[in-house]
Amino acid sequence: MNLHLDVEIETEQISSLRLKATLVKDKSVILFDQEINDRRISITTRIEDVEGWTAETPNLYEIRLELYQDNQFVQGKKFDYGFRQTEIVDGIFLINKKPIKLKGVNRHDFHPVKGWAIDKQTRETDIRIMKSHNINAIRTSHYPNDRHLYELCDRYGLYVIDEADLETHGVRTFLPKDDSRWLDAMIDRGVRMVKRDRNHACVVMWSLGNEAGFAERATIIPVSYTHLAGD
């Protein structure tokens, strides 16, 4: 399976910098270790014998990025990453070439006592309860959730339909529709969601929003499959 990394370095001085990228699970594999002369670096490499990620087998690797200047460590970042492929073939949703049935629920950040102030322990309890009842998918109705939710879904194994914060319930027959005054705001919400969450293996589908009026532009979105609730 191919792994592609886009790295952007925010620094005024670009000289004498070296970037090292490592993939770690049972063993370490160096993906990249070179001097760089640009603030944006693209790395593409082939990974053999990958253990794929699914809700039943949530195999995660750790990617470590290390920045050196004059061979002295400057800064590092690490994050979990799962390898999986999604596609629709003859109307069947496949993950890693195998048909998947989504047995999912809509989930709000809510607690009978704490209200909308959800802490990490409460969120993890939600996920554990869902897994114990054979739920394998979550729709983040009706907004992107805290980053912690996606980390939990990566780790425990739940598929996620990630929903943009776009809803005009009650006035959806005329807002936002094709009103160009709303276009930049709508695009901004979707783009920020995708940029933030695209590296999570659990996210298998993007939702454009919930009950926000179907527009002509939505019929020409150049992606294989989309979700827009209520329209």
Model-predicted regions and their roles:
Residues K103-H108, E163-S180, M186, G190, ...:
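Aromatic- and acidic-residue-enriched carbohydrate-binding clefts of CAZyme catalytic domains
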Residues H148-L149, H169-R172, A215-R217:
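Extracytoplasmic/secreted cell-surface and envelope-processing proteins
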Residues W182-L228:
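Active-site neighborhood of glycoside hydrolase catalytic domains
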